[in-house]
Amino acid sequence: MDGIKYAVFTDKGIRLLGNNQYTSNVESGSTRTEIKHWVELFFGVKVIAMNSHRLPGKGRRMGPIMGHTMHYRRMIITLQPGYSIPPLRKKRT
């Protein structure tokens, strides 16, 4: 899984789980077709739609110098009905 960094569980991301949509951050150089191929190959699901947007980096101050973090890309992946992605981590007991 070279392009997918991690799953995102924000308020909107949790709400979209009910619509069989999964949110994850991916590398900014990855294309939609690459991400679709990786998701279908790794999880064994069928992807019907993909939406993406680029999020800006945040400003970071290091003494008198103002720097910034890198921007990143977020993908919203819609799966066919009947398919789902299992949780990435189990809850500790």
Curated annotation (Swiss-Prot):
One Gene Ontology term of the molecular function aspect: structural constituent of ribosome
GO CC terms, sorted: chloroplast; ribonucleoprotein complex; ribosome
InterPro entries from the UniProt entry: Nucleotide-bd_a/b_plait_sf, Ribosomal_uL23-like, Ribosomal_uL23/eL15/eS24_sf, Ribosomal_uL23_CS
Quaternary organization: Part of the 50S ribosomal subunit.
Job description of the protein: Binds to 23S rRNA.
Location(s) in or outside the cell: Plastid, Chloroplast
One GO term (biological process): translation
Similarity comment: Belongs to the universal ribosomal protein uL23 family.
Entry keyword Transcription: no
Full protein name: Large ribosomal subunit protein uL23cz/uL23cy
Pfam families named among the record's database cross-references: Ribosomal_L23
Location (main, coarse): plastid
Species of the source: Platanus occidentalis (Sycamore)
The entry's keywords: Chloroplast, Plastid, Ribonucleoprotein, Ribosomal protein, RNA-binding, rRNA-binding
Source taxonomy: Eukaryota, Viridiplantae, Streptophyta, Embryophyta, Tracheophyta
